[in-house]
Structure formats: structure tokens, C-alpha cells
Amino acid sequence: MRKVILAVILMLLILLLNATLHAAKWEHLASSGVYVYYYDVDNIGYLSEVTVQIILKQTYEDKDSVNQFYQKYATDENSIELEDYSISTMVINCADKIVGIKSIISYKESGEVLLQTNFNNINYLFIPSGSIYEALYDKVC
């Protein structure tokens, strides 16, 4: 019995250590007045000499105000459940200064996934001057 308890404790410690090692390290990128943006500094992937994959987290500066705005226009047919945060996988081509979105996942604070969208074909857009994407470009390119 003692060996079983010791094995369970050891497994829990391994799981805890594994979760800690793979936790995202979010660094503040910018704020827009409505949203706050962070990027995961530990998971920047250089896919080629000019292409970078980044994980971007978006939260609200004042979620209650945004929620009140959405609920003002919601009806029974189109009720809106506002996420607490979203995680996007972005791809930036540094040479051409373009950005595309690979996926977006919207979450509740509990970790429950509200919506997940994966894009098979990435549509790239030029990075506008002064945008969140330019701030991200400046960090990783």
C-alpha cells in the first residue's frame, strides 16, 4: 500500500512539473483601449528564415463595459457569450511584412473552449503601421 501511495505522489509531482515546464510565458505587447495583447515569448517558432509563428493572447481591459455593449444588441435568437480571453496562432512573413491567422480559440476563464476556428488556408494581410501586428512584428522580426 505504501508503494502505491508513493507512486501516486511521484506521478502527481511529474505532472505538476510537466505543466510548469510547458506553461506559457506571456509578455505584454500592447493595449488598444478595449483589448490587452500578450505574446508567448517561449513559443516563438521560426518556420523559415523569414517566417515566424507566434501565439497571441487577447484579453479585455474592461470586460464588463464590452459585455454591456454586446448585451444591448443581443436578442433571444442571437445571444452572445463573451469569452474571457482568446488565443491566436499568428504567422508573420518578416521579409514581406505580412501577417496571417492560423487559428483562434476563445475561452472562458475556467479554460472551457467556447469556439475554435482553424484556417486551412492562411490569408495574409499587409501589416498596418501603428497596429498591434506591427508591435508584434517589431518584437519577432
Annotate the PLM regions.
Residues 1-4:
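Positively charged n-region of N-terminal signal peptides that target proteins for export
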